[in-house]
Amino acid sequence: MTVLMSPDELEAALRAVGAARYHNRHPFHQLLHGGKLDKRQVQAWALNRYCYQAAIPIKDATLIARTDDSELRRIWRQRLVDHDGTQPGEGGIVRWLALAEGLGLDRDMVISERRALPATRFAVRAYVDFVRDRSLLEAVASSLTEMFSPTIISERVSGMLANYDFITRETLAYFNARLDQAPRDADFALDYVKRHARTPEQQQAAIAALTFKCDVLWAQLDALHHAYVSPGLIPPGAFGHDGIWS
């Protein structure tokens, strides 16, 4: 029989998920941060990651539309502003596109997502569907990977700047804002989960939701590693298939 945890015990259980399963542990990220990839492999990462970045405000808008809690809507909508901005040319998606262009990728090609890996698109779609279909508590809990993102951001920025001569601080400007945004968002979401997971079943559902989100992020890197590192099997139509890197 599952025992009801205290809020602090629940937080510890959630953090243990990240310690074991967050994608900073993935071999592809270790290669990326360690300077072991070539430019085309880094381009493939940026192109595929765009699919995830572009889906985040869709996921957040889906969550907002589901709740009758006005406080939750007010606070959560800041995430839309962070990613979409308040006018054209602002927001995290625009900054990610600048990163992609800084790596030499065509902006329209990236936006179209037509050269992304099928597994990337499937994983991203699964995340949006999860937030739409599962309980509101699970939807909020699935965002808690942001508890762990400051660590991976600092590793990524320092490692990529040190190891790749084709990357500059301007290229990686996207991550500057996320160092403040992610902890703010995670603090609110964690407090929400600790207050609303009131039964053992709800607590286990929250832990499972965070586990699922870690799996979504891990699966995207599995696909990148399989296509662009080993065994190097790029699917038809994807970036680099048949030697076409555009």
Swiss-Prot record:
Keyword Oxidoreductase: yes
Catalytic activity as recorded in UniProt: 6-(2-amino-2-carboxyethyl)-7,8-dioxo-1,2,3,4,7,8-hexahydroquinoline-2,4-dicarboxylate + 3 O2 = pyrroloquinoline quinone + 2 H2O2 + 2 H2O + H(+)
Presence of the UniProt keyword Nucleus in the record: no
Role of this protein: Ring cyclization and eight-electron oxidation of 3a-(2-amino-2-carboxyethyl)-4,5-dioxo-4,5,6,7,8,9-hexahydroquinoline-7,9-dicarboxylic-acid to PQQ.
Source lineage: Bacteria, Pseudomonadati, Pseudomonadota, Alphaproteobacteria, Acetobacterales
EC number of this enzyme: 1.3.3.11
Protein's recorded name: Pyrroloquinoline-quinone synthase
MF annotations from Gene Ontology: pyrroloquinoline-quinone synthase activity
Species of provenance: Acidiphilium cryptum (strain JF-5)
Keyword terms of this UniProt record: Oxidoreductase, PQQ biosynthesis
Pathway given in the UniProt record: Cofactor biosynthesis; pyrroloquinoline quinone biosynthesis
Recorded family membership: Belongs to the PqqC family.
Enzyme class, spelled out: oxidoreductase
